[in-house]
Swiss-Prot record:
Organism field: Synechococcus sp. (strain JA-2-3B'a(2-13)) (Cyanobacteria bacterium Yellowstone B-Prime)
Catalytic activity: beta-D-fructose 1,6-bisphosphate + H2O = beta-D-fructose 6-phosphate + phosphate
Protein name, as recorded: Fructose-1,6-bisphosphatase class 1
NCBIfam families referenced in this protein's UniProt entry, alphabetically: PRK09293.1-1
Binding site residues for Mg(2+) 2: 116, 119, 275
Keywords: Calvin cycle, Carbohydrate metabolism, Cytoplasm, Hydrolase, Magnesium, Metal-binding
Entry's localization field: Cytoplasm
Origin superkingdom: Bacteria
Length: 332
């Protein structure tokens, strides 16, 4: 039996409870983000068949990381989807040192979109899941635009956040601060249709997700957490190497995802503004928690657009378990 068809654009309007200009602009913005997701999903589905979809570009991105062909395509897809729309003035991306300014939009909108256009892109050559992450901000009016100071604001000020997961199906999950909702792309309609409403992360889950290859580089507290779960029944390790895919599992099934700092990189690897903040926003909206190990992710005042942070995110009880290991009150 077919379920009720509620499209993404209609759902956004329902979230605002009105047809105000703000609601319509947000609905249009989510549609353009969804359009970029459809473009990326189509390209990924053809990745083994067309030239220039697999492998690396031969250059490094602003993070000093080897850029995959699909990283570059995904970044351009978001820019193309938002040009000439009047919806977003600035686009901050993992793939660009400075924000892309869309001058034709700035007379109509001051909103900024923060994106990781393609998370986990090293998975593509092996045909594994990847994702896109996004966050919508309103620049602070009392801060100068120079050096993008007006964008450096805590994650609690996000207007909306979400991600698109490219897997067996293409799914979009988002929140405007009124719960977390999931949509599945119906290829026959070309529309994202509501498939999960008011998602709540379980208070506790069995999954822990982290790359244990870095064990020797972690702090004693993180090492003790790994020893703790190894020595007890009821814990399952799942790690794909794609943040969106691993977080999506935690969101639906419960558990905890960890990407802690290491001896070489105590600041962590994940970017605050367009990776940790959006997912932390979703986690808290769904009843979960997100922390660096010392402070809530959403309370951090960013110092730069590409700032990195450690991340511990997931079910409240699981996150608390990690924190107790860090403080030494829970021992293996």
């Amino acid at each position: 039996m077919l379920r009720d068809v509620l499209t993404l654009s209609r759902h956004v309007l329902q979230q605002f409870g009105s047809f105000t200009a703000e609601a319509q602009d947000f609905s249009a913005l989510m549609n353009r983000i969804a359009l970029a997701g459809k473009m990326i999903a189509r390209r990924l589905s053809q990745a083994g068949l067309i030239e220039g979809a697999l492998g690396v570009t031969g250059s490094l991105n602003v993070q000093g990381e080897e850029q995959q062909q699909m990283d570059d395509y995904a970044n351009r897809a978001f820019i193309r989807a938002l040009e000439q729309t009047g919806l977003v003035c600035r686009l901050v991306s993992e793939e660009m040192k400075t924000p892309a300014r869309l001058p034709e939009n700035c007379s109509l909108s001051r909103l900024a979109l923060m994106i990781d256009p393609l998370d986990g892109s090293s998975n593509i050559d092996a045909n594994l899941s990847v994702g896109s992450i996004f966050s919508v901000l309103h620049p602070l009016e009392d801060r100068p635009e120079a050096d993008n100071q007006d964008l450096l604001q805590p994650g609690r000020r996000q207007l909306a956040a979400g991600y698109i997961l490219y897997g067996p199906s293409t799914q979009l999950v988002y929140s405007v601060g009124k719960g977390v909702h999931g949509f599945t792309l119906d290829p026959s309609l070309g529309e994202f249709i509501l498939s999960r409403s008011d998602i709540r992360i379980p208070e506790r889950g069995s999954v822990y997700s982290l790359n244990e290859g870095y064990f020797c580089q972690w702090s004693e507290g993180i090492q003790n957490y790994v020893r703790y779960v190894h020595r007890r029944d009821g814990y399952i390790s799942r790690y794909s190497g794609a943040l969106v895919a691993d977080f999506h599992r935690i969101l639906l099934q419960g558990g905890v995802y960890l990407y802690p700092g290491t001896q070489k990189k105590p600041e962590g690897k994940l970017r605050l503004m367009y990776e940790a903040n959006p997912l932390a926003f979703l986690a808290e909206q769904a009843g979960g928690a997100a922390t660096t190990g010392t402070e809530a992710i959403l309370d951090i005042v960013p110092q730069s657009l590409h700032q990195r942070v450690p991340l511990i995110i997931g079910s409240r009880e699981n996150v608390e378990e990690v924190l107790r290991c860090l403080e030494g009150s829970l021992v293996p």
